[in-house]
Design a protein with these regions (language model features):
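Long, intrinsically disordered, Lys/Arg- and Ser/Thr/Pro-rich regulatory tracts
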Residues: 1-41, 310, 322, 343, ...
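Long, low-complexity, serine/threonine- and charged-residue-rich intrinsically disordered N-terminal tails
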Residues: 1-202, 206-216, 226-231, 278
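Conserved ASCE/P-loop NTPase catalytic core
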Residues: 103-104, 120-128, 133-135, 144-149, ...
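Conserved phosphate/pyrophosphate-binding and hydrolysis machinery centered on Walker-type P-loop NTPases
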Residues: 116-118, 264, 280-285, 448, ...
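OB-fold/S1-family single-stranded nucleic acid-binding modules
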Residues: 143-145, 221-258
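AAA+ P-loop ATPase catalytic core
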Residues: 288-295, 477-480, 496-511, 528
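C-terminal engagement/docking regions of AAA+ P-loop ATPases
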Residues: 477, 486-496, 509-576
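Short, surface-exposed polybasic-aromatic patches that bind anionic ligands, especially phosphate groups
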Residues: 483
Length: 576
């Protein structure tokens, strides 16, 4: 009785009792002596703010978390009492089982709920929604009668039992009055949970269905019953951008200061930590940098809805590219690899939401249906299924060996840009590295692991920065695009312009700036020119990636001078 009084005080304080009274009055207005004999249900949805409940009545909040079914039973008793208190003769014909309070939880602290599935208490699960079925009927009210017409022996149940109940008086098996059945809607929602191999499906009913969006992370609050799991509430998990005052890892802070905030130098050094033991330090830097930019863009897309940078590499041999992709994918929140036996690429892309979808094999190894499906999804930005539509929320990483130029250009137009794979530029360095690894194999040490951990932390810190382009940077990108388009119309397309802008903005984001300047624009252009198949716009000397920073600075300075001549625009005079 004490629990009833506490819940009653809470409902009164939050003005829920008034809402219950109004719901009861509306119910009685809609029934008469004839319809009341059909045992219609009265349902009331109670939205409980758990944080507020814990603040007002801590013991009551703890009771809700530990004993949710008893809490709901108390609410049912209170709603039935509200109905009985009304001055209406029809209330005498209403049974307690006709009354049901549907509890929906808001702001349930994840740290207070149980994470392991067990009876009684509320269990909170956090997972990625990867699929929804078509709506079907959800039976929430059934009436069972005695075939011998025993008086007053109707049984009201909120589900369809596997075995029909029996009459309390004559012990006959009851039959259901199918005309009195009440139904709502339900769907089967499939969630992918971290550290659990197989996805799990849950039944989502009525008002909760509208909250479901495929590809989003959700916190699901469930109550484990004997034969089923009841979902009480579902809330979308949103990532909050890190505050500006959040401390940066000390090593990255020192590196940024040593690089004077120059994007080409700072990002070059950051990207060099990817795949340290896969290839020599200065090999495939164009690939490493683009992988890093893609990782940042995925996280930024979740926080600021900025464009995602996809990754495509081409070359005579892309074996090292596949290894670098595998190492870089470990920095993402999640990643999914597509094999040649995947029948549905859309499922893999949805499963990779918030992370990256890696195609570890060359494009030639995949079926034409798989390639066409992925290209169509990247181009439209939508994943279409028979029962739902979802936005593409992951980056796609792919590579192809010995692709014809026209094929590479067409696919690169959809991906946005092309990275330079192995064209024999680093044959000597790779041979020496392979020999050294064979003689003295090395493993990833503590310093390498810490460096990658710092980069992952740094990506989380900068991803929430909203970036805009300065007028001069925007003009620089436009002039380069027009000049390059005039030089090679097939190699430079509209899709490349979007990738240039995204790379420029991501460069500024990595440097913790909310305005992209000319340095960011030149860096994005340098990446674009470096990744093109030969013959490239700029001389090879201007696109080298030496391990020495002084040599790299000379390369970038030469590229600045070449770019000014290529577009007829003075960069330094207007550099902000």
């Amino acid at each position: 009785m004490e629990r009833h009084l506490q819940i009653l005080l809470y409902l009164e304080k939050r003005h829920f009792l008034v809402d219950m009274k109004n719901a009861c009055q509306e119910f009685l207005q809609d029934v008469n002596e004839k319809t009341i004999r059909k045992f219609p249900p009265i349902r009331f949805i109670l939205q409980v703010d758990v944080m507020e409940l814990l603040d007002l009545f801590p013991d009551l909040g703890e009771f809700l978390i530990q004993e949710p079914l008893k809490w709901q039973s108390c609410c049912n008793d209170i709603l039935f009492a509200c109905l009985k208190c009304l001055d209406n003769d029809l209330t005498q014909m209403i049974k307690p089982t006709q009354v049901a309070v549907v509890i929906r939880l808001n702001s349930l602290p994840y740290i207070l709920s149980t994470k392991q599935e067990k009876y009684k208490s509320i269990v909170s699960l956090c997972g990625l929604l990867v699929g929804i079925t078509k709506p079907t009927n959800n039976v929430y009210h059934t009436v069972w009668s005695c075939p011998d017409e025993c008086e007053g022996n109707e049984v009201i149940m909120h589900f369809i039992p596997k075995i029909p109940p029996k009459c309390y008086l004559c012990k006959s098996t009851l039959f259901e009055n199918s005309g009195l059945r009440r139904c709502g809607d339900q769907v089967q929602a499939t969630f992918k949970f971290k550290n659990i191999l197989l996805p799990q499906s849950y039944t989502i009913v009525d008002d909760l269905i509208s909250q479901l969006k495929v590809g989003k992370m959700y916190t699901i609050n469930v109550v484990i019953l004997k034969k089923l799991t009841s979902v009480w509430s579902i809330e979308e998990s949103t990532i909050i951008p890190a505050p500006i005052t959040t401390p940066v890892p000390s090593d990255i802070k020192e590196l940024y200061e040593a690089c004077n905030g120059l994007p080409w130098k700072f990002i070059y050094c950051l990207a060099s930590s990817i795949g340290v033991h896969v290839c020599p330090l200065n090999c495939f830097m164009n690939v490493k940098i683009n992988l890093l930019l893609s990782l940042v863009s995925v996280k930024a897309n979740a926080l600021t809805s900025s464009p995602i940078i996809h990754f495509l590499a081409g070359g005579f041999d892309t074996g090292y590219i596949a290894k670098l992709m595998g190492r870089a994918a470990l920095l993402a929140d999640s990643f999914v690899s597509i094999g040649t036996t995947h029948n549905s690429t859309s499922t893999a892309l949805i499963g990779a939401s918030g992370g990256v979808c890696v195609m570890p094999l060359p494009l030639q190894a995949y079926s034409q249906n798989q390639i066409n499906s992925i290209l169509s999804i990247i181009e439209t930005g939508e994943i279409t299924h028979s029962t739902y539509k979802s936005k593409l929320q992951c980056a796609v990483w792919a590579h192809g060996m010995d692709l014809k130029k026209i094929v590479l250009y067409n696919i690169g137009n959809i991906f946005g840009s092309v990275c330079r794979g192995d064209y024999g530029d680093f044959a000597d360095e790779l041979a020496d590295h392979a020999l050294e690894q064979a003689i003295t194999p090395t493993t990833v040490g503590k310093q390498e692991k810490q460096a990658l951990k710092d980069i992952s932390t740094y990506i989380d810190l900068v991803a929430g920065i909203k970036v805009s382009l300065a007028e001069n940077a925007e003009e620089l990108l436009r002039l380069y695009f027009l000049a390059a388009r005039k030089e090679k119309p097939k190699a430079v397309t509209i899709g490349n312009l979007g990738a240039l802008i995204a790379a420029c903005a991501t460069s500024a984001r990595l440097c913790r700036r909310n305005v992209a300047n000319n340095d960011d624009a030149v860096f994005a252009i340098w990446l674009h020119v470096s990744g093109m198949p030969e013959p490239r716009f700029a001389p090879d000397d201007y696109l080298e990636t030496p391990a020495d920073m002084k040599k790299l600075q000379k390369v970038i300075e030469k590229f600045y001078n070449w770019l000014e001549q290529f577009i007829g625009y003075r960069i330094y005079e207007t550099n902000e």
